[in-house]
């Protein structure tokens, strides 16, 4: 992957994503849906989904596939791939080599955002697409992305089956006779900027924040991103997928699922060696909040910290519940004590809360 000569940041990343000063990362689009992205720990995400499935008694994978299907359609609605839908469905007009070329567009994106290396196995126009991904992770996310892209190209409903064998993911997409019956709650959130803004130090050549270029390494051959501090694998994950998952679970189970998400993320964040250590309280929180912002998780509109307590207002968190849980985990790591949260406001697009040491 070609890198910026000044900061080492991948040039493809600079062309695909915009690191905004409000703590969000946007996928650059020419029209169509605006997509918000976050740089997340792949194992932590998988742990979140696995823990949710175990606690609620059923797998959330099918919800992730459906949510990501819509994200996949939105992403590729303005890429070269959709023009294939104007080409008649036949072996003469849609030979396999042409489809492989189109899938290469998706494959380069998949590789760039850390999900592995894509290979097309077979294709029949209007009927099926079989492919596999080496060094894959978060299988439902990948399956949903390719399902959405395939439906966009073919212009008909499709269905997907997938299986993991080690780190190789096999995906089989076939035409479906069923209409799209996706729930309206699986819509994509609109992205709005917060009031606060960070003045990042940016590379003069590519415009990327200098600190993010120093935080992570890219392995273009294996299609992976590595956090230099932890050695963990990171991925660029669509924020709208997470929020669609939460809406669906709230509809099926009720609002209590928020507490399950919160408690699970606190536990996972405490396990991960990502909390910065600093002697001064202000320096600690400045560093920690900046790290979350650089990963596209948002930045508070207001933040106050005291002895064993923090109070936050935020309007652009990647997910309000999960962001609050990360703050709680950081406080617990700093104090060595468990914490309690009091929500003053808890909407999808804005929240206010106080977190303090448990008494």
Name each model feature, range by range.
Residues 1-141, 159-313, 318, 344-352, ...:
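N-terminal accessory segment detector
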Residues 141-156, 324-335:
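Short, non-transmembrane amphipathic alpha-helical segments
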Residues 155-160, 335-344:
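Low-complexity, intrinsically disordered Gly/Pro/Thr-rich segments
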Residues 316-321, 327, 338:
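C-terminal regulatory/effector modules of DNA-binding transcriptional regulators
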């Amino acid at each position: 992957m070609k890198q910026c000569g000044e900061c080492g940041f991948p040039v493809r990343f600079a062309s695909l994503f915009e690191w905004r000063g409000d703590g969000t990362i946007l996928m650059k689009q020419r029209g169509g849906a605006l997509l918000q992205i976050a740089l997340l720990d792949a194992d932590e995400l998988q742990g979140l989904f696995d823990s949710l499935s175990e606690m609620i008694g059923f797998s959330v994978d099918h919800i992730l596939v459906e949510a990501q299907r819509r994200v996949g359609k939105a992403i590729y609605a303005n890429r070269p791939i959709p023009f294939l839908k104007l080409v008649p469905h036949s072996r003469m007009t849609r030979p396999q080599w042409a489809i492989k070329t189109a899938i290469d567009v998706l494959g380069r994106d998949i590789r760039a955002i850390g999900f592995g290396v894509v290979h097309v196995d077979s294709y029949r126009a209007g009927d099926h697409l079989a492919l596999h991904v080496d060094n894959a992770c978060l299988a439902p996310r990948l399956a949903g992305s390719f399902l959405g892209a395939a439906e966009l190209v073919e212009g008909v409903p499709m269905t997907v089956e997938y299986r993991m064998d080690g780190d190789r993911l096999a995906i089989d997409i076939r035409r479906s006779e069923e209409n799209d019956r996706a729930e309206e709650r699986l819509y994509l959130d609109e992205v709005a900027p917060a009031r606060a803004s960070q003045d990042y130090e940016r590379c003069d050549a590519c415009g990327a924040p200098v600190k993010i270029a120093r935080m992570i390494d890219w392995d273009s051959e294996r299609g992976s991103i590595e956090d230099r501090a932890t050695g963990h694998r990171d991925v660029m994950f669509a924020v709208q997928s997470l929020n669609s998952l939460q809406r669906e679970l709230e509809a099926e189970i009720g609002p209590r699922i928020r507490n399950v998400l919160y408690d699970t993320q606190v536990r996972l964040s405490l396990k991960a060696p990502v909390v910065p250590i600093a002697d001064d309280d202000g320096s600690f929180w400045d560093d920690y909040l900046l790290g979350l912002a650089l990963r596209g998780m948002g930045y508070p509109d207001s933040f106050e910290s005291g002895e064993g307590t923090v109070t936050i207002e935020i309007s652009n968190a990647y997910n309000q519940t999960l962001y609050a849980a990360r703050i709680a985990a950081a406080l617990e790591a700093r104090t060595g004590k468990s914490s309690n949260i009091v929500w003053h406001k808890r909407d999808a697009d804005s929240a206010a809360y106080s977190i303090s040491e448990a008494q």
